[in-house]
C-alpha cells in the first residue's frame, strides 16, 4: 500500500508529453533530483526525503535557426559508469549538462535536411548504455554518443537505422559481460520495437512488429521487454526472440510512462498508476505477473511517473496543467505487502490479464480473481 505524501511545487505546470518526469536519487547527499518539461524550459528541483524543495534551476532550449522558440521534448538523467549527465532534447537539438545542470558540456544541432516541409523535427527518447548515450530522432534514427570519463570530448559514434517513424522511447539494462545479449530496445510511433546489442558497433538483433498503435514507453527487465502502448496495454516480450509472454489490459487510455525498480510501474491518461510484480516461475521459467497496487490521481491527465528509489518504496507523478509533483510512499515493508495483500498470478502461455480500470469487453470466457478479470487464451 502507498499513501500520498507532501507534493513538490513547480514554477510551471508539466507539458502534455509522455515520460515527462525524470528522477535521480543521490543517497550520499540524501537528496532526490526531479526534472520536468514545461514548454521551452525544463525545471530541475532538488528535494529532501520529506519533500521539502531545496533548490530549483530552469534550463532553456538552446536557440537555433527559426523564428519560434524551440520546445523541449524530454529531460533525462543518464547514469554512466564514471559520471552522470543530464540530457535535454528539443526541436533544435540535443543538450548535455553536468548532473546539476550548471554547465553544458555538449550541443548537437539537428539536421532538418531530410525532413519534409510538413514534418516536425525533434529528438526524443534518451537512455544510457555503458559509456554510450542513445537519443532517438524524428526520422526514426537513433544517435549513439560515446561519452568520455570526464570533459566535453563527446563524439557521435554511430547512427542506428531500424525505424521508419519517429522514435518514442529507449530502454537499456546492463549486459553484465554476456555476449550476444539484448541490452537496448527502441520504440516508435508505429509500435515497432527494435532490439539491439550494444558495443563499439551496435547490432540489430530482432524487430517486434507493431499493431497499429504507438508505443510511448518501454523498459527492460532481465532480458524481458515491457512495452506500454497507446491502447492501454502492457506487453511483455522475450528480448532476444521477440516472443510475446504476457499481454495486460492495464489501462483504459494511452500509457504515458513505465518504470522499473524492480517492480513495474505503469501510468496512463486514465488517471491511474499501477504497480506490478514481475517474476519467473521456478518450475518452467514462465513470466509471472502480480498486481501490487493501483493509485488514482483524480481529474489529472498523467504524463509522467517514476520510482524515486531503487527499492521501489516511493514514486512520483506529474500531470498536464498540474503545477506540482505528486509523491507517494509505501506504508508497509515489501515483506508486509506480500503477506497482507491478496494477489493473482498468470503464466504467459495461458492467460491475458485485464486490469479493473481497463473497461473493455472480451469475447473470451472470463473469471474474476481478486477484482481482476483474467481472460484465457
Summary of predicted features, one role per range:
Residues 47-52, 99-105, 146-152, 197-200, ...:
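Short loop/turn segments immediately following beta-strands, especially the blade-tip
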Residues 15-26, 65-78, 113-127, 164-176, ...:
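Canonical WD40 repeat/beta-propeller blade segments in eukaryotic WD-repeat proteins
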Residues 1-2, 29-63, 100-101:
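Beta-propeller domains
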Residues 37-38, 88-91, 136-139, 187-190, ...:
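Conserved strand-to-loop turn within each blade of WD40 beta-propeller repeats
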Residues 43-47, 94-98, 142-146, 193-197, ...:
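WD40-repeat beta-propellers
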Residues 30-32, 82-84, 130-131, 181-182, ...:
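Short coil/turn segments that connect the beta-strands within blades of beta-propeller domains
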Residues 2-20, 29-31, 272, 278-358, ...:
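Terminal intrinsically disordered, low-complexity extensions flanking WD-repeat/beta-propeller proteins
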Residues 9-13, 55-66, 106-116, 156-162, ...:
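Short C-terminal beta-strands that terminate individual repeats in beta-propeller domains
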Amino acid at each position: 500500500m502507498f499513501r500520498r505524501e507532501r507534493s513538490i511545487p513547480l514554477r510551471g505546470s508539466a507539458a502534455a508529453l509522455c515520460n515527462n518526469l525524470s528522477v535521480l536519487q543521490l543517497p550520499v547527499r540524501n537528496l532526490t533530483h526531479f526534472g520536468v518539461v514545461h514548454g521551452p524550459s525544463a525545471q530541475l528541483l532538488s528535494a529532501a526525503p520529506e519533500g521539502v524543495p531545496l533548490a530549483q534551476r530552469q534550463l532553456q532550449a538552446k536557440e537555433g535557426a527559426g523564428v519560434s522558440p524551440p520546445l523541449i521534448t524530454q529531460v533525462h538523467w543518464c547514469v554512466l559508469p564514471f559520471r552522470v549527465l543530464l540530457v535535454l532534447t528539443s526541436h533544435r537539438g540535443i543538450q548535455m549538462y553536468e548532473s546539476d545542470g550548471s554547465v553544458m558540456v555538449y550541443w548537437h544541432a539537428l539536421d532538418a535536411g531530410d525532413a519534409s516541409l510538413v514534418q516536425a523535427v525533434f529528438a526524443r527518447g534518451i537512455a544510457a548504455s555503458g559509456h554510450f548515450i542513445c537519443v532517438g530522432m524524428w526520422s526514426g534514427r537513433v544517435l549513439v554518443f560515446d561519452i568520455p570519463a570526464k570533459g566535453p570530448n563527446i563524439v557521435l559514434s554511430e547512427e542506428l537505422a531500424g525505424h521508419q517513424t519517429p522514435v518514442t522511447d529507449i530502454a537499456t539494462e546492463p549486459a553484465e559481460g554476456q555476449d550476444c545479449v539484448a541490452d537496448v530496445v527502441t520504440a516508435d510511433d508505429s509500435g515497432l520495437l527494435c532490439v539491439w546489442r550494444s558495443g563499439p558497433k551496435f547490432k540489430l538483433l530482432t524487430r517486434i512488429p507493431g499493431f497499429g498503435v504507438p508505443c510511448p514507453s518501454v523498459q527492460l527487465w532481465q532480458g524481458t521487454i515491457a512495452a506500454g502502448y497507446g491502447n492501454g496495454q502492457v506487453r511483455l516480450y522475450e528480448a532476444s526472440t521477440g516472443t510475446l509472454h504476457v499481454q495486460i489490459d492495464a489501462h483504459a487510455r494511452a500509457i504515458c510512462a513505465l518504470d522499473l525498480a524492480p517492480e513495474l510501474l505503469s501510468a496512463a491518461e486514465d488517471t491511474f498508476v499501477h504497480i506490478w510484480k514481475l517474476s519467473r516461475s521456478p518450475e518452467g521459467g514462465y513470466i509471472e505477473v502480480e498486481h501490487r497496487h493501483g493509485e488514482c490521481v483524480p481529474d489529472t491527465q498523467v504524463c509522467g511517473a517514476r520510482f524515486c528509489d531503487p527499492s521501489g518504496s516511493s514514486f512520483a507523478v506529474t500531470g498536464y496543467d498540474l503545477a506540482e509533483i505528486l509523491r507517494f510512499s509505501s506504508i508497509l515493508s515489501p515483506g508486509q505487502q506480500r503477506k497482507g495483500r491478496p494477489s493473482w498470478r498468470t503464466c504467459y502461455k495461458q492467460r491475458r490479464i485485464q486490469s479493473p480500470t481497463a473497461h473493455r469487453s472480451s469475447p473470451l470466457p472470463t473469471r474474476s480473481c481478486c477484482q481482476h478479470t483474467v481472460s484465457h487464451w
